[in-house]
Amino acid sequence: MRHLITTKDFNKIEIMELFKEASDFLDEKPRTFLEGKSITTIFFENSTRTLSSFESAARRLGARVLRLDVSRSSSSKGETLYDTAANLDAMSPNAIVVRHANSGVPLILAKHMHCPVVNGGDGKHAHPTQALLDLFTIYNHFQSDVEGKKICIVGDIKNSRVAASNIELLSRFNLDITLVAPPHFMPNTHLKKYYKLDENIIANSDIIMSLRTQTERHNKTVYASLKDYANDFCIQKSLVKDKKLILLHPGPVNRNIDISDEMMSDERTLVLKQVKNGVAIRMAVLKKLILENEG
């Protein structure tokens, strides 16, 4: 049984095949590949973008979607993860998409399921489809020429599952990664790292990936105000200037904290393209896992 728990679950050849399929899906036309199939989404953490993206992807492939309301589910009343998995499995879905605040939950569920499990984000651990859509966006922009491209990841890297998945995936595709964050947001790493964003770092970058501060994962107050953080790490036109690069963000964007209003409307900012690409990538992932499982 194949699952997508981390980006390591797909090899490079499979990822390139996903990109080819996703490129075809960018026309947004409905398909019937998963007609008669059922996909269950169960998000124990709030989500707008990822949940909507997966559900749009499923419906465009012709699948039915069952969204479980976690606030009313038995898990909120003390049901164990094993029992949750057993009950989900008894409904005989063709795939399950799960998000949870605790790292490792999708893997635990996958061990008890008879259908593919897709990780929609677990704690600080992983967000594989976000990393895949980010690389897909980079890959398309640079017309397949991504090896050696310099990417600067800025923000709350230590607490970000998006950063963790991107670092693994982008390293495998030989991008040159630099991390920029305050000391308390910087993970232990062998990668190049800086504790303040400046013009020289941006001048040396082909891609900037800005991340949201994960205040919900902080066990103490780090900044008296997010404006203090923004003074050092907000992506602003005065820093970027006319540099030829692209700017990414997984969303939601804290405007004038992560990225300035001016840069959000700049043509180099590809946030909305990431959203469009995300549906196509998730279509490719769901199709691959479900049809391979039944083949």
Curated annotation (Swiss-Prot):
Keyword Transferase part of the UniProt annotation: yes
EC number: 2.1.3.2
Enzyme class: transferase
Catalytic activity: carbamoyl phosphate + L-aspartate = N-carbamoyl-L-aspartate + phosphate + H(+)
GO molecular function: amino acid binding; aspartate carbamoyltransferase activity
Superkingdom of this protein's organism: Bacteria
GO biological process terms, semicolon-separated: 'de novo' pyrimidine nucleobase biosynthetic process; 'de novo' UMP biosynthetic process; amino acid metabolic process
Binding site for carbamoyl phosphate: R49, T50, R99, H127, Q130, G251, P252
KW Transferase (keyword) present: yes
GO cellular component: cytosol
Pathway per the UniProt entry: Pyrimidine metabolism; UMP biosynthesis via de novo pathway; (S)-dihydroorotate from bicarbonate: step 2/3
Keywords for this protein: Pyrimidine biosynthesis, Transferase
Coiled coil start-end: none
Binding site for L-aspartate: K77, R161, R212
Subunit structure: Heterododecamer (2C3:3R2) of six catalytic PyrB chains organized as two trimers (C3), and six regulatory PyrI chains organized as three dimers (R2).
UniProt family annotation: Belongs to the aspartate/ornithine carbamoyltransferase superfamily. ATCase family.
Its biological purpose: Catalyzes the condensation of carbamoyl phosphate and aspartate to form carbamoyl aspartate and inorganic phosphate, the committed step in the de novo pyrimidine nucleotide biosynthesis pathway.
Protein name: Aspartate carbamoyltransferase catalytic subunit
Source species of the chain: Campylobacter jejuni subsp. doylei (strain ATCC BAA-1458 / RM4099 / 269.97)
Name of the gene: pyrB
